Amino acid sequence: LIKELVNMVIQHAEEEEVKELKNPCECPRALHRVCGSDGNTYSNPCMLNCAKHEGNPDLVQVHKGPCDEHDHDFEDPCKCDNKFEPVCGDDQITYLNLCHLECATFTTSPGVEVAYEGECHAETTNAMEVLFQGNPCECPRALHRVCGSDGNTYSNPCMLTCAKHEGNPDLVQVHEGPCDEHDHDFEDTCQCDDTFQPVCGDDEITYRNLCHLECATFTTSPGVEVKHEGECHPETKVNQLILKSCMCPKIYKPVCGTDGRTYPNICVLKCHISSNPGLGLAHLGECKVAVLAKETGEVRNPCNCFRNFNPVCGTDGKTYGNLCMLGCAAETKVPGLKLLHNGRCLPKEQL
């Protein structure tokens, strides 16, 4: 009799297993609670597996038993920002930062570990092609609003990256938090027409029109100014393809070059150094007002500012778009103006 009961139990278990293989949501009513990585308690492992198949493919079991308040720490393993602090995984893929690598252990690359800090070596993989593995629009539902350079607010950095891949390749994050009325000033930095009214930049490159030159100050040629109207003279024109071999992220993490120009990030500076061996790093952060170039003794225009919105408050009680813009005002409009603090001025500070 005992043997028959054991056989019946085994047969029932096998039937349940077959059912689960046929339809993952045909689950027994047995109460055997487990905690999911989304912070929810499921009646049994089969119910968790059902939820996984019904729209939450990254769901995994955290532990047996119901979830408690601490288990919510496991929600959204892919809630990562887009700060460029690359790490190379032992799968020879460059990840945007450590968080993105840890996210991959839950999604595309289970068990991946850090091989070393920095981008993977060029001979192993093209770093910029693999910063976002899989579908860039498979985003967590986490609410961590960011403001895009198109003036739109995105639910989180992943949603902004999705929009970038879906038809807006020049889109970048301006700042964390929702956009406000001032952020629309930064829309469409490089939306230029093709009218041929050439100008020659002081980088000896001919630009199709003034708008294209101004666009270059945000992308390939930070700090470039108009040398004269019309095309550059052929004998002085330099190779315009120098920078095409440099694949740099469109992240604004400014550094100051020894030529007195502010570069959007260290990668762009290194790219310019490759064609200008005398150029070097002066310091991290934007160049100070009227930096004296070491090689030429030339004083750069203090109003060659990027339009990234990183507000600062001046001692005049006014909010400036970024530190460079405050420096420009100090040199041209408000002598003696200094930085009061980072961030917008408070109402009580406004004069």
UniProtKB/Swiss-Prot annotation:
GO molecular function annotation: serine-type endopeptidase inhibitor activity
All copies of domain Kazal-like, residue ranges: 19-69, 72-122, 131-181, 184-234, 240-289, 297-347
Superkingdom of the organism of origin: Eukaryota
InterPro entries for the chain: Kazal_dom, Kazal_dom_sf, Spink4-like
Principal cellular location given in the protein's record: secreted
Family annotation (Gene3D superfamilies): 3.30.60.30
CDD domains assigned to the protein according to its UniProt record, in alphabetical order: KAZAL_FS
Entry function: Thrombin inhibitor. Prevents blood clotting to allow insect to feed on blood. Also functions as an inhibitor of trypsin and plasmin.
Name the UniProt record assigns to this protein: Serine protease inhibitor dipetalogastin
